[in-house]
Amino acid sequence: MEKPILKTKRLTLRPVQLGDEKEIHEYAGDKEITMMFWLPNDTFEETCDFVKRNAEEWESDGQLDYEFVIVYEGKIIGGCDADLSHSEDHSYACLGWIINKNYRGQGFASEAAAALLDFTFENLSIDKVYAQCDCKNPASFGVMKKIGMTLVDDKGTRTYPKTGITSGELTCLITRDEWEKKRG
């Protein structure tokens, strides 16, 4: 697949690339933002490893994770991904997103997630897309609802590897049929 550039009214989503490390670490290294993430990048070295791994993934023939940076007015303000590795047969994708705290509350996550959802159904051979968030993260749950997803499980749990903290997890889903109906 050719590396896609996704455009919205205000944002550009482009594949993660070498050279993005500093701007990504501004949010990926912020514990206030990443406290609800599986693997926050506590150190700049971890962010560099993340960028290298995801830049290489874009070059891979067997690509399973489509990691984008979210660019607003020339600045990387967040990231989002569609990940197929959560199922053994790669039959569905899981979406995720993160926004620099200085850019929250402006609809950027919803705008990026909607573009990512469109990319996923338009380019990947799947019929379901999931997203999950910590039950204490109403903003992400709101994004899921805004892009047309439906809550399918509110009884899940997640344990964060770096802290050992266990919390509730919400899982939302949208099917290809639902997405197509929503688009008209």
Predicted region positions:
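PAS and PAS-like sensory modules
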Residues: 65-67
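Conserved GNAT-fold acetyl-CoA-binding loop/helix
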Residues: 32-55
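Short loop/turn motifs at secondary-structure junctions and domain boundaries
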Residues: 58-63
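Acyl-donor (CoA/ACP) binding surface of acyl/acetyltransferases
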Residues: 1-35, 52, 69-184
